[in-house]
Amino acid sequence: MKKRILAGILCGAVVLSLVGCGSKDKESTSALGTSATQAAASDTTADNSASDAASDTTATETAAPVADYSDDENINQYSAFAVRSESLHDGHWDDENSNAGSNKSLSPDLSWDPVEGASCYVVYMVDVSANYFLHWKQDNITEPKVAEGFSDRRHYVGPYPPKGSTHNYVVYVIALKNPVEKIQGSLRDGCPQIGDFIKALDTDKDGNTGNILGAGKISGLFKDNV
């Protein structure tokens, strides 16, 4: 009888031990599953953060530069827009744009974003190294771009500084609500009053003021090595 009781006690102990082990295994498995889930969530969060950071960097790198002409009294009172040119390389105008030697004297390529409300644009180019010598005056441009060679010799003459010297040539693009009667300035002449010529564009051909909607600018150097 005692042996049977002892055997029963031993069997009960074994069963309890097995139940306890199973419970611990379940707890361990549950703990491992929880840890794996947390790790996966952490990795996903890290991946999302990295993706967001990459997007922010890309947006910053591809954002268009903001035009700032606050240091140019000729146009700093107008809304600014950026001007681009494929005729500029390393800050210098191409030889094809020059009138030096046998160069072609082609007016430069220009482009800019459309200005809201503008029906036309005016372009001026001056040599700021030589008393604002006027190289380009073109009106009635109806698209936000001009191809290289757009202007003929009545409206454009390319840079031709003294041999061996480097001059700085500034192009102004003025956005107008309406056309004007006439743009001022004489080609191949010094125009230190270029600011006044630009201000005159603020009155359209019918005498209405407030005609200038914005102004853009781009500049480049040219050195005569011919």
Short names for language-model regions:
Residues 1-4:
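Positively charged n-region of N-terminal signal peptides that target proteins for export
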Residues 17-20:
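C-terminal motif of bacterial Sec signal peptides marking the signal peptidase cleavage site
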Residues 22-39, 47, 54-226:
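N-terminus-centered regions that define maturation/targeting leaders and the start
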